[in-house]
A protein has these predicted regions:
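Alpha-helical "hinge/linker" immediately C-terminal to small N-terminal DNA-binding modules
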Residues: 1-13
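Central regulatory/effector-binding core of bacterial HTH transcription factors
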Residues: 19-82, 232-235
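C-terminal effector-binding regulatory domain of bacterial HTH transcription factors
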Residues: 48, 173-174, 178, 187-235
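A local structural motif
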Residues: 48-52, 136-145
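Beta->alpha turn/N-cap motifs
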Residues: 57, 73-75, 95-97, 167-170, ...
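Flexible hinge/capping segments at coil-to-helix
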Residues: 80-118
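Secondary-structure junction motif
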Residues: 116-135
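Hydrophobic hinge/microswitch elements
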Residues: 139-191, 202, 229
């Protein structure tokens, strides 16, 4: 089957028009907030390409899983894969103006001890928030009545004034721009163990079908542009 697929891809690589089905695996939150909003324009640009978007957070085998391209957040891509970083993944902490008016605005990381903080909640370490500013690092144990391991859920909880939540910037960006939420402690960099670069990965450069090259070029153009003019956390 793999030999047949390679033969088809080899034929596809000689085609100048991008066409056929492409399977793209992405982390769930990245798929929802970054990639899915870009797909409509891709379909207009490449009307003969069909896309299967898989939202999944698990290790991949490109051949066994039938994956053409994958996006993963990492600083160390798997050996043997080809790829390129598209954008850095930063995290911020946010709240609504209404929450801050009722409970006060934190001015230092230690002030968070007096607040309800919405964390990832997968391990105890997720409630120990770490910050950096001008070479100084502070770690604060936080408490909150609610934790959730999905970014969309945490964003919704923040919007409902449940507390101060940790969010990837790509999740919070639209709500920040609309004024639905505000960044807390913007002078401090929030250090998350889930940060890194968003890498676009593929198994090999040989006999690359035109549809794969089209998606690589499209994501290389559109994803980095998402950071242009956005509110980045302090470095």
């Amino acid at each position: 089957l793999e030999a047949a697929r390679q033969a088809m891809d080899s034929a596809g690589s000689r085609q100048t028009v991008a066409q056929g089905k492409l399977t793209l695996s992405v982390p769930k939150a990245v798929g929802r907030f970054v990639i899915h909003p870009l797909m409509m324009a891709f379909f207009h640009r490449y009307p003969q390409v069909d896309v299967c978007l898989r939202l999944e957070d698990r290790p991949l085998d490109f051949i066994d899983d039938g994956i053409d391209l994958a996006l993963r957040i990492t600083d160390t891509p798997s050996p043997g894969l080809h790829g390129k970083p598209l954008m850095p993944i930063r995290h911020v902490i946010c709240a609504t103006e209404a929450y801050l008016q009722q409970h006060g605005t934190p001015y230092t990381p230690q002030d968070l001890r007096a607040h309800s903080c919405i964390s990832l909640g997968e391990t105890p370490a997720d409630a120990r928030w770490k910050f950096r500013r001008e070479g100084k690092t502070e770690t604060v144990p936080t408490y909150g009545r609610y934790a959730a391991n999905h970014t969309a859920v945490r964003l919704d909880a923040v919007r409902q004034h449940l507390g101060i939540g940790s969010l990837p910037l790509f999740t919070a960006r639209e709500a920040l721009a609309n004024g639905d939420i505000v960044q807390v402690l913007p002078e401090w960099e929030f250090i998350s163990s889930y940060s890194g670069d968003l890498w676009l990965l593929w198994a090999g450069d040989k006999h690359m079908p035109a549809r794969m090259r089209a998606m690589i070029d499209y994501l290389s153009e559109t994803v980095p542009a998402l950071n242009a003019g956005s509110t980045e956390p302090a470095k």
